[in-house]
Amino acid sequence: MRNKKILKEDELLSETQQAAFHQIAMEPFEINVPKPKRRNGVNFSLAVVVIYLILLTAGAGLLVVQVLNLQARLRVLEMYFLNDTLAAEDSPSFSLLQSAHPGEHLAQGASRLQVLQAQLTWVRVSHEHLLQRVDNFTQNPGMFRIKGEQGAPGLQGHKGAMGMPGAPGPPGPPAEKGAKGAMGRDGATGPSGPQGPPGVKGEAGLQGPQGAPGKQGATGTPGPQGEKGSKGDGGLIGPKGETGTKGEKGDLGLPGSKGDRGMKGDAGVMGPPGAQGSKGDFGRPGPPGLAGFPGAKGDQGQPGLQGVPGPPGAVGHPGAKGEPGSAGSPGRAGLPGSPGSPGATGLKGSKGDTGLQGQQGRKGESGVPGPAGVKGEQGSPGLAGPKGAPGQAGQKGDQGVKGSSGEQGVKGEKGERGENSVSVRIVGSSNRGRAEVYYSGTWGTICDDEWQNSDAIVFCRMLGYSKGRALYKVGAGTGQIWLDNVQCRGTESTLWSCTKNSWGHHDCSHEEDAGVECSV
């Protein structure tokens, strides 16, 4: 009987060991100890398991922290995509994400988050399995050679962990382009801009032909002295004229009145001794003249064209007495004067006594030079010579220096809107196309009857251009035909000042709409 009990115990033990072996084979991480012999091995195994659990718990905690961080980042990313719009596109964090991963940061963040969630689930399941193994290891009676009771049937296993997420799918097709938005309303007319700078000084014109010399006018009363003018531009230098023929010596003029005492001149060449004249009286000094202001020195002009010498003029009428001139340079020695008329013969005196021979007298002092004669009267102007041939056009002068821009004027108040305002426009391009006018709240065209370049110039002037050219066959317009038979001279400021039919009166169709081509 005892042997049978021993055999039964051996069979039970072997069955228990086989069951434990099968259980160990099913659990891949369970320590395989088929025959523990000492208590020290069990303690060592428990210590190893505890250390492993601690490390696993620490690793799971780190994974949880990383998952929480990624979830926080995911919430931040979701904020940018609420209602399919980027509400916070200008934030620094969004721009930083875009600069770091411009096309991949969203897909990579979502895939990494899914991978971490799967790893966290796997760690949680592994942790549960490890706890079950520890329970099996500590509660297994076969490990301590104790017959255990038959265990209750195990609970139904938990649902398996979610599988690893699949690879992200290919990007979807690009979205269709949205419909074009409605055209916005016309903006309000802005205030007029400030006044522009003054224009550049124009080029100097061509020199005109030399005019005929005018007759000498009567001497006018001297006007008040004007202010000193600014320095003028240098004139063109005319050509040097031919030397005139020397005039004949004029008749001896009447003796002039005694003039003021002149300044002492340089000693002239001694003339032949003349008859000793009587000593004249000293004249009274004249009043000093007003000192004139020196004029600004002009630039040297270019030589003018050679003129045709005119015939000698006739003797002119005596002019008014001129003001005393400044002292001139010393003149050349004058010709010897004509001998004076002999005096009347005196009575013959009685012969006087022979006187003593006197001493030779000293040489007398040189007499005071006589006053300068009055300047001869100016001859009358000669007959006008034949008109010279027009000279060649001079070279184009250098462009003048651009004047300084004036100070910006004060901005004027905005004017009130006028009633029945009229304006013009070009349909086609900015400066070429069909001419249209705005009248009574409606745009209309112009008939090309009598439409010429002068009309186009006035039309372009209304748009700020300076030149214009009339065009025809520029394409038919629509709506009203406001003007017909427009006839401008080209100097008008607007078309409304030109001769034309009344507004809306015409005999044309839109095939005859007028056009313009404007230029600066």
Swiss-Prot record:
InterPro entries: Collagen, Collagen_superfamily, SRCR, SRCR-like_dom_sf. Expressed in alveolar macrophages (at protein level). Detected in macrophages from various tissues including thymus, kidney, Kupffer cells of liver, and spleen. Keywords: Cell membrane, Collagen, Disulfide bond, Glycoprotein, Immunity, Innate immunity, Membrane, Receptor, Signal-anchor, Transmembrane, Transmembrane helix. Residues 410-419 have a biased composition (Basic and acidic residues). It holds the Pfam family Collagen. Residues 203-227, 290-345, 380-398 have a biased composition (Low complexity). It is a single-pass type II membrane protein. Residues 147-419 form the Collagen-like domain. Coiled coil: none annotated. This is Macrophage receptor MARCO. The lineage of its organism: Eukaryota, Metazoa, Chordata, Craniata, Vertebrata. Its main location: membrane. Residues 142-423 are annotated as: Disordered. One of its GO terms (biological process) is positive regulation of ERK1 and ERK2 cascade. GO terms for cellular component: collagen trimer; collagen-containing extracellular matrix; cytoplasm; endocytic vesicle membrane; plasma membrane. PANTHER family: COLLAGEN ALPHA (PTHR24023), MACROPHAGE RECEPTOR MARCO (PTHR24023:SF1083). It is found in: Cell membrane. Glycans are attached at residues 83, 136. Pattern recognition receptor (PRR) which binds Gram-positive and Gram-negative bacteria. Also plays a role in binding of unopsonized particles by alveolar macrophages. Binds to the secretoglobin SCGB3A2. N-glycosylated. The keyword Cell membrane applies. Residues 1-43 are cytoplasmic. The gene is MARCO. One of its GO terms (molecular function) is cargo receptor activity. Residues 65-520 are extracellular.
